[in-house]
Design a protein with these regions (language model features):
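Short, acidic/turn-prone active-site loops that include or flank metal/cofactor-
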Residues: 33-36, 190-195, 220
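Short acidic/histidine-rich active-site segments
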Residues: 210-227
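Short helix-capping segments at alpha-helix termini
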Residues: 61-65, 157-162, 208-210, 238-244
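Active-site/ligand-binding-proximal alpha/beta "capping" segment
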Residues: 88, 94-95, 208-209, 229-241
Length: 263
């Protein structure tokens, strides 16, 4: 089945991996910026990643045979204060690229003052550029997850950003109902530290009247989890969910949310 992976960190994946992913049926992907960096860096490190995303990654997608789109942001961990301010200043220029379809990952992980400042600033940038956002939230097993997701939603509302243009990513069972009640899209990340495919499929099957609310993604950045989105689709097929409903979840929903120019 053809699908779109709306959260795929291709900058960390080699050509062989991307070929395997394309062979599973992925026709397009959205490449988000990481929410954190491993170390302490100045602005040049982030600008280099942005440049790769809007140049090499787009060309590589065309060469291998999938459409690549980009979501950019300033990470809330791993930059000096000077680097953070410089990236915020430079970000609007990068958003002029037609293949930049969102801001993200933005959001909160532990709720520090810096995270909140950056989150608010980038929500305003997204609003001024009429772009949706991909919001990072704590992994499903994080004890502080329920509290942080409440803070995330509160900040979005305080900044008057439209909830229907938000993906609250990395959903877990304990925060699922709250996310659904928020009015945002619910990001069902399917990877080793988020949810397994069967859990994602069960949430979808138990909410068949709300299929338009789900965004299924792999969040793949390393390892061999090439097949997680197709595995969700297969689990839904085994449960006899109609083909058109599965297609809606794994293709039509991300296409519509990001307004991707695809068939």
């Amino acid at each position: 089945m053809r699908y779109i992976d709306p959260h795929l960190h291709t900058v960390l994946l080699d050509d062989g991996v991307m070929m395997k992913i394309a062979l599973t049926g992925m026709e397009a992907c959205v490449i988000p910026m990481f929410h954190c960096l491993n170390g302490i860096f100045e602005a040049d490190a982030v600008l280099t990643l942005w440049d790769r995303s809007v140049d090499f990654e787009l060309k590589r997608g065309g060469t291998i045979g999938y459409e690549a789109f980009v979501s950019l942001s300033v990470p809330f961990l791993g930059l000096t204060d000077k680097g953070t301010d410089e990236c915020l200043k430079r970000l609007p220029d990068y958003l002029k690229n037609d293949r930049v379809v969102a801001l993200g990952e933005i959001g909160l992980d532990v709720g520090t003052a810096l995270e909140k400042r950056l989150f608010r600033a980038q929500l305003q940038i997204a609003k001024s550029h009429n772009l949706p956002v991909i919001c990072h939230t704590p992994i499903r097993l994080a004890a502080h997850g329920p509290e942080i997701i409440r803070q995330v939603v509160s900040i979005i509302k305080e900044e008057k950003f439209p909830m229907d243009r938000v993906i609250l990513d990395h959903a877990g069972e304990s925060t699922f109902d709250f996310r659904m009640a928020s009015g945002a899209k619910v990001g069902l990340s399917t990877c080793f530290d988020k949810m397994p495919p069967e859990s994602v499929a069960n949430l979808i099957l138990n909410n068949r009247d709300k299929l338009d609310r789900f965004i299924v993604n792999s969040e793949l950045a390393s390892g061999d989890g090439y097949f997680t989105v197709p595995m969700v689709a297969l689990a839904l097929r085994r449960a006899r969910l109609p083909y058109e409903d599965i297609y809606k979840v794994v293709y039509e929903n991300p296409k519509a949310f990001f307004k991707l120019p695809l068939d």
